[in-house]
């Protein structure tokens, strides 16, 4: 069974739906995002979250290894390396997406807790699924948004 997507991306002025759930063009917030390495290096620019915030408080993740559940946001932003689990790589992308969506100065295309994007639900669903293919799709979409032009540089 294929998972339904709730994530969409904005490219230029046209909305591109990734995975099938469309929203009116007026609902898209903007084509900006900052990558994980930006957020790791500029912790003073974080809004609504702190470096010691735990990833386990942001997403339902009982099926993850204990070491991953105990990561702080700052730790999750570290490059996990080529041998990292898919879930660990997802946590890095997810933390960056939350920091982008929370920042008033970033016109990020996804929202954390509201329609039509529901980052929290999309990320929690991917983690809970245990399906590495599904997690990779979410990682790809989050990374695409996280690597849009960063207005905070």
Identify the residue ranges that each predicted region occupies.
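Extended, helix-rich scaffolding/adaptor regions
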Residues: 3-4, 25-27
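Hydrophobic helical h-region of N-terminal Sec-dependent signal peptides
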Residues: 12-14
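C-terminal segment of classical bacterial N-terminal signal peptides
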Residues: 17-25
């Amino acid at each position: 069974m294929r998972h339904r997507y709730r994530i969409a991306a904005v490219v230029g002025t046209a909305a591109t739906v990734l995975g099938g759930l469309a929203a009116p063009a007026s609902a898209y917030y903007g084509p900006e995002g900052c990558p994980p390495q930006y957020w790791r290096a500029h912790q003073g620019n974080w809004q609504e979250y702190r470096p010691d915030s735990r990833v386990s408080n942001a997403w339902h993740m009982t099926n993850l290894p204990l070491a991953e559940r105990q990561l702080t946001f700052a730790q999750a932003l570290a490059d996990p390396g080529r041998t990292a689990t898919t879930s660990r790589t997802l946590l890095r992308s997810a933390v960056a997406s939350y920091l982008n969506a929370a920042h008033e100065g970033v016109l990020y295309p996804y929202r954390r807790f509201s329609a039509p994007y529901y980052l929290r639900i999309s990320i929690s669903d991917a983690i809970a699924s245990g399906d590495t293919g599904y997690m990779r799709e979410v990682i790809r979409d989050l990374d695409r948004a996280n690597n849009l032009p960063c207005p905070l540089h």
